[in-house]
Amino acid sequence: MRLEKIAAKALENVGFDRYLLSIAVAKRANELATGKEPLVEVDVKKYKYTDIALMEIAEGKLKIEVEKES
């Protein structure tokens, strides 16, 4: 699947909130960079951590929760 389609699906999975998606991708990419295992089966040497994070969100492997301020 093309990266544009993956990004569109990931955006849909976070309620079309680009800010939320960018924060989630950055946090997950940081986790992957520090040694966490990817939740999708990909060659980590072939893809960037941000691309893997997008794939995980697009496939619904990561659940993004928004903390509500009181």
Curated annotation (Swiss-Prot):
Give the top-rank taxon of the lineage listed in the UniProt record for this protein: Bacteria
Reactions catalysed: RNA(n) + a ribonucleoside 5'-triphosphate = RNA(n+1) + diphosphate
The UniProt record lists the EC number as 2.7.7.6
What Gene Ontology terms describe where this protein resides (cellular component)?
DNA-directed RNA polymerase complex
Name the GO terms of the biological process aspect: DNA-templated transcription
What are the alphabetically sorted keywords of the record? DNA-directed RNA polymerase, Nucleotidyltransferase, Transcription, Transferase
Q: Which GO terms describe its molecular function?
A: DNA binding; DNA-directed RNA polymerase activity
Task: Give the record's subunit note.
Answer: The RNAP catalytic core consists of 2 alpha, 1 beta, 1 beta' and 1 omega subunit. When a sigma factor is associated with the core the holoenzyme is formed, which can initiate transcription.
Q: What does this protein do?
A: Promotes RNA polymerase assembly. Latches the N- and C-terminal regions of the beta' subunit thereby facilitating its interaction with the beta and alpha subunits.
Q: Which family does it belong to?
A: Belongs to the RNA polymerase subunit omega family.
Q: Can you say what this protein is called? A: DNA-directed RNA polymerase subunit omega
Organism, as annotated: Nitratiruptor sp. (strain SB155-2)
Top-down, what is the taxonomic lineage of the species of origin?
Bacteria, Pseudomonadati, Campylobacterota, Epsilonproteobacteria, Nautiliales
